[in-house]
A protein has these predicted regions:
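Short, solvent-exposed turn/loop segments enriched in Gly/Ser/Thr/Pro and often Arg
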Residues: 33, 163, 208
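Short Asp/Glu-rich motifs
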Residues: 38-40, 194, 214-215
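GST-like fold's C-terminal all-alpha helical module
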Residues: 100-197
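Terminal-tail/helix-coil boundary detector
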Residues: 201-215
């Protein structure tokens, strides 16, 4: 069985959980409490020297970086593909996914937020202001990209889930957690609303994880 080492609120781990659920794969969650720095323990660093989640264990091998893990799963289990068959369409989906995962998320991940608070002395209000600013900086262009794509489907690209949706939903979740106003992003809001009616997204949500009460 596939094992995913992660933290319930990690956006990167959340992405992988969504992919696993969309593909209806059997998987086991191995919680790693980032608040307690369990990712810095030698036993974890042996499998990921970066000390980051998620880590996927598959057939005795360990894989890191959420997008690499998801593409590995997509190739290993081609049913319910997360990337389109056309080369142009694949590039468009990857472009949007990378925009979220590589440009938006790194500015607001837990490591950054902890540094802002512990090292720079920002208050919770200032930290939220930081988060909201960078969400707006990312979601503005993303909303335009979605509108310009010409797709009116229920997902980022038409009527099928893709890597773009897998990346978008965790970012929206965390934006809402930090009280970000989504009223200016109706396309993003509609995708979020639809995805959260689906079992795969519900099962992958942070609140549904066994470590959701972790302190």
């Amino acid at each position: 069985m596939l094992k995913i080492y992660g933290f319930y609120r990690s956006s990167a781990a959340y992405r992988v959980r969504i992919a696993l659920e969309l593909k209806a794969l059997d998987w086991e969650s191995i919680p790693v409490n980032l608040r307690l720095d369990e990712q810095k323990q030698d036993s974890f660093l042996q499998n990921n020297p970066q000390g980051l989640v998620p880590v996927l264990e598959s057939d005795g091998k360990y894989f890191t970086q959420s997008l690499a893990i998801i593409e590995y799963l997509d190739e290993l289990h081609p049913e319910n593909p997360l990337l389109p068959s056309g080369i142009y369409e694949r590039a468009k989906v990857r472009g949007m996914a990378y925009q979220i995962a590589m440009e938006m998320h790194p500015l607001n991940n837990l490591r950054v937020l902890k540094y802002l608070k512990n090292e720079l002395g920002l208050s919770e209000e200032q930290k939220s202001t930081w988060y909201q600013h960078w969400i707006a900086e990312g979601f503005g262009p993303l909303e335009k990209t979605l509108k310009n794509s010409g797709s009116e489907g229920r997902f980022c690209f038409g009527e099928s889930t893709s890597l773009a949706d897998v990346c978008l939903i965790p970012q929206v979740y965390n934006g809402l957690r930090f009280n970000c106003d989504l009223s200016g992003y109706p396309r993003i809001q509609s995708i979020w609303d639809h995805c959260m009616t689906l079992d795969a997204f519900k099962n992958a949500a942070p609140e549904a994880q066994q470590d959701a009460s972790a302190k």
